Amino acid sequence: MKTNNDCSNDPVLQALQAASDPIRLNILTCLVFNSEKRITSETYNIVKSTLSHHIKMLKDAQLIQEIKIGKTKKYILNQEYIERELPGLLELIRFRAKDQEN
């Protein structure tokens, strides 16, 4: 039985749920303005396991992709997917970031 909280089969709901957390939204905002970025737990003042959870949520929602360079992991936005499945989301994130600057 599917419940209202079951987002696993709906990619739009899964992406919106992933983006709704303040830390994950900040990660997305950072990636909107940086083509690729190494994301560390120190940046967000959280433990590594919590950061791993946030990264997994964003990857599972197909909002970000991981690039491995040696032992280093960097992340990029999955822009093609976002523009196709969630048109307007990148513009909302950009608007939010610019609004917070002012």
Give residue spans per PLM region.
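Helix-turn-helix DNA-binding motif, specifically the short coil turn and the N-cap/start of the second
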Residues: 47
